[in-house]
Amino acid sequence: MAPFKTLCNKGINMEITAVTTFHYEGMLSYGQRFLDSWAKNVDQSIKLLVYAEDCTPVANSDNIIIIDAKKALPKLVAFKNKWGAVPKANGIPPQEIIDQRPRDHHKKFKWDAVRFANKVYAVFDAVERSTDWLVWVDADTYVHSPWSREDFVRQLPNESWITFVGRGTEKQTWPECGFYGLNLKHTKCQEFLAEFERMYEEAELGIFKLREWHDSYVFGHILNIMRFQNPNVFDYSAGIYIKTAKTGGGGHPLINTELGRWIDHMKGGRKGKMKSSVEKDLMTARPEAYWNEG
């Protein structure tokens, strides 16, 4: 487990906005459960924007705001209209990548730009509805323990222009984008967001110029460039990896960071069990009651 670092943050009164998105099937499988856990456990001062696609989730708290994704995200609709029927944007890489990547070209998520565009366009719109910090949280997350404002603020150090969950230092790795924070008052963060959006709006000259085009890879590509220009970034998992990850996977870092005190992330096949595996996913035992329940 990464050692906890006390992050003194003078902005105790800063506005914190979180954002997530899901479709109808996602709402039934994990999304509503996430919203209910947020309403129960997260401090009321922290707002959650929910971009709902073709569904009507229940907001059981005044700090949860439901937004119709199709109405609020015209750029996402345009992106899907343009790329929705194009194989390379939907998990089928072009032949040159198939030739270059015999071991992993079949892993469709790496080239599914349309699927992951839902996340990034929700972020781009939420930026316009936020003031100080914007935090992305995947909808297959579960807030298992009370999360106070003070503890939440500590995860967003004002000296950093971005926070993220890394997967090690090997050049092939990309962040685990289930949770990240954007310091909107910082000029470098604004530069990052402008380039992030450009990569999608000018896709042929943006995401499709990269080796992979899922959102985490695009995020990591821009981050790796801009952190050399301004190294004031905060990696929640910096203390986890003694050795560099051999591939981009890097295990299940989020729950092994300080964030695991409050949230679980049911990424991939974990959605069916509705909980990460204590035996397989935790690097060391955690003291929180959630991780010790039968």
Predicted feature locations:
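N-terminal anchoring/stem segment of glycosyltransferases
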Residues: 7-105, 128-130, 184-187, 270-273, ...
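GT-A fold catalytic core of metal-dependent nucleotide-sugar glycosyltransferases
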Residues: 111, 115-165
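Short beta-alpha junction loops
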Residues: 52-57, 141, 168-169
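A structural signal for well-ordered alpha-helical segments within the folded catalytic domains
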Residues: 29-32, 117-121, 213-221
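Catalytic core and acceptor-binding pocket of nucleotide-sugar-dependent glycosyltransferases
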Residues: 184-290
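Conserved catalytic core of nucleotide-sugar-dependent glycosyltransferases
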Residues: 144-212
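Short acidic-hydrophobic catalytic motif
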Residues: 108
